[in-house]
């Protein structure tokens, strides 16, 4: 399998022939963090790379440091206007003028296919060997769904990413 979720470590491991892409869940499976991308690693606990045990602590442990946490956490898909002052992955504005968005983790699914991206250029899975991880995230205030797609073409040593946003 190209994609594995370790329930005990809350880590998703996506592997090709030569690379690993590791994504972690933090703070009681609330936040999706980028852990590692690089040379293939196997069976290692890389959660320490999320640095959630260091100050500023995760919001469930210290609510006063919420903004500091957002500004330092290696978010896989960062929000906007909630304390993370780095370049954000998403920017929205509602009719009421709300613009703060913080997608948090809801669930995941792993499929044995590459989803199509209508109207967009994308890789194809003619041999039907690709595997896709879908991380379902949601901003409850804006009622905004953010689905993160990661497709692994293990034999081609390629991982593709895309995002689908809906409200």
Per-segment meaning from a language model:
Residues 1-167:
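N-terminal accessory beta-strand-rich subdomains and adjacent acidic, glycine-rich linkers
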């Amino acid at each position: 399998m190209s994609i594995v979720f370790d329930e005990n470590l809350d880590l998703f491991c996506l592997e090709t022939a030569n690379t690993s892409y590791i994504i972690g869940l933090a703070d009681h499976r609330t936040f999706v963090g980028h852990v590692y991308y690089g040379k293939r690693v196997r069976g290692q606990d890389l959660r320490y790379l999320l640095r959630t045990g260091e100050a500023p602590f995760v919001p469930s442990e210290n609510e006063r440091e919420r903004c500091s946490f957002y500004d330092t956490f290696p978010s896989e898909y960062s929000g906007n206007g909630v304390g993370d002052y780095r370049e954000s992955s998403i920017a929205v504005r509602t009719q009421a003028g709300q613009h703060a968005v913080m997608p948090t983790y809801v669930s995941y699914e792993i499929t044995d296919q590459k989803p199509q991206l209508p109207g967009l250029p994308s890789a194809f899975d003619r041999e039907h060997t690709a595997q896709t991880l879908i991380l379902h995230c949601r901003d409850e205030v804006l009622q905004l769904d953010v689905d993160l797609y990661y497709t692994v073409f293990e034999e081609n040593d390629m991982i593709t990413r895309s995002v689908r946003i809906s409200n």
